[in-house]
Amino acid sequence: MIMITPEDILETMDLEAQKVCAKTFLQERPNATDEKLTEFIVVSLPYSTVNKTLGESDDWWLDITVVFEIFVADRKTRSNPKEFNQPAMKRLRNALMEVFPIVVPNQFKIDFPRTVIPASSDGHGYHYTRIQAKMTTMV
């Protein structure tokens, strides 16, 4: 039996996010970086894992809600120091939606993505979009 760990899931999510954005982070955004980032993606597993069994053979599977958060730096102008960079957010969101479904053969799949927060200010110079998807094991 293949044991699937949270680290396996996060690593796969991170690899897929890197196809869309050069800078990615696991679980949470950093408090500080060496350079000002214009865009980045955070991949996380913020919810509990649901273990399920089925039948007399005790076949099992996991269901987890996974989260991809896209952060785009605000445009700073004299008239609006927190202007939302809508073209950049749209580009990244559309590109990320294109990587689904994410399938690791004989292990798990991540599918049914949905945007749950379309664009909101984080109060720290970025707007973010949250995309949730369903991860289900395939063993």
Q: Residue ranges of each PLM-predicted region?
A:
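Short catalytic/ligand-gating loop segments at beta-alpha or beta-beta junctions
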Residues: 29
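A short, hydrophobic beta-strand-centered structural micro-motif
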Residues: 36-47
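Charged, amphipathic alpha-helical segments and their flanking helix caps
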Residues: 1-25, 33, 47-139
